[in-house]
């Protein structure tokens, strides 16, 4: 049993292979299988109204609360491919179901990569045969985590040990990240014995305060998907609060890894807003700052430019006292009552982690934190050549 990742909990096996979908020749397909005895499943998906074919198929299949296997491919998003894209997604599901002796409705499917290119179905189906070949499925969570990478530089795994039961997970995604998950595919597994309702509550609560508050570049993917699969193999049923805590811890860890590996990242930035009417307004204000390119450029340059913070937050749909706003960088006041504080320009932001705190001055109880990164030369270079 693995020390971390999707095969750390009891009842799960995985496989990975190189099907030739990625131009790099790196591994590009993975499979996660729940061996039971239970098969509860929960999921959350992108809120982008232009969503990929695998999202449509997975939404349909998880609707009954059970998923027994999830198929992943990297290098091709199978998004914006019309009816052919949906046909291909369903064909891959049927092929896998037949190989595993399952129903089509037991299968989740996830794709990531370039938008607008048809899947090479000959390679995909051959890859499915490799993933399900005799001896392929086993304690291969680490290999699966590597196979789903696209522009990621490192694989992302996690594990949370509870009282006799475990939550494991893997994720990918470094760009096109904005609330509504973040361009990412995440698979969480647990050997706890839980109902679909318990799993969905835990997953929805966790993603709302982890992945949904990760905003790298303001772009929301067509393919975002997070699955939580429960095998019940531990024989232990946690309370809802215990499950919530473990799933949150797993999501938080993966979200931190996504932020740390964001495309071109040199700074990991947390933007916290307080002093507005409610949490919804606070998160709107934090996102407004986190998405502001001038602010992000200042972070790249280690420049404590509080004026850019004020200019950005002033555009937010949040209650504020425009003449009473305060800004703190790494705990040091740089702006008080919307005016520069002594020593503001001397604040040292040369470290990799920057904490920005903004008080909107209303004395309201709203507060929220959004995690983002700087805007570097490397980010532009990576994304200017993504389809070439």
Curated annotation (Swiss-Prot):
InterPro entries the record matches: Arg_biosynth_ArgJ, ArgJ-like_dom_sf, ArgJ_beta_C
Active-site residues, record numbering mapped to chain: 183
One GO cellular component, as annotated: cytoplasm
Xref: Gene3D superfamilies: ArgJ beta chain, C-terminal domain, L-amino peptidase D-ALA esterase/amidase
Similarity comment text for this entry: Belongs to the ArgJ family.
Quaternary structure (record): Heterotetramer of two alpha and two beta chains.
Name by which UniProt lists this protein: Arginine biosynthesis bifunctional protein ArgJ
Gene assigned in the entry: argJ
